[in-house]
Amino acid sequence: IPPCIPFIMYAMATGESVSELFLAGIVPGMMISALLIFYAYYYCRRHGEDREKIQAKMDQLKAKGFFNILKESIWALLSPVIVLGCIYSGVASPTEAAVISVFYSLFVSLFIYRSIKVKQIWGIMVEAMKTYAPILFILATSTAFSRVLTLMQVPQDVSAWIMTHFSNEIVLLIVINVVLLIVGMVMDTTPAILILSPILLPIVEHVGMNPIHFGVMMIVNLAVGFVTPPVGVNLFVASSLTNVPMMQIAKKAMPMIGYFMLALLLITFIPAISLCLL
């Protein structure tokens, strides 16, 4: 869903339109969101974890009233507006917009909500470093790994092997999906897109697949890899933030990964899901 940075990287690697990719991602993104919301609702209804706590929070919110809640949250809601506004107006790049968002959030927390104090900033920075240091290490090693693969011409060999052994369109797309899922588990999104897009795109175009459709399929694949053990980066983020063991989170995430896979199959074999807004 816009402003999806991997779509921008895919556009850079293939020359496709960023705006068309953003449009193509809306319906698949909403479909995936709906599936995950359905599972979360079903899980909470069935297992009832923290039901009393959730109900108490809901009663508290209802007592406040919608407009009071909106008034309290308006400054926080402006943060994504500022980020998207900076990106789409050309005022800042996505990275620069993220920095602007950090300073805006810090200003709001210090002077409007007053939820933190100046003396707490250093501790917050230390906690942020503890959270993201393992992630940066993973990204660094995955970038080096992708460089080694490029030098060994592994992507070209994989492409040649796929073209040689699979001529059926359905089987070919399934194999490409499997390759992308495996890559997404061990490699960061950006190098994966930059390395594999120019190699796999001619293959899927050969069987009549739209490049925009393939871009959506690829990004969804890599998104699944981000939450798939053993190297799913988002698992490390969740583990660091919640102090819950990573494998425990991974176990709970497996049903959601299953819904992701269902969405991936629908996106792969029903092009209209991605292309209906173009």
Predicted feature locations:
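Alpha-helical transmembrane segments of multi-pass membrane transport proteins
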Residues: 1-278
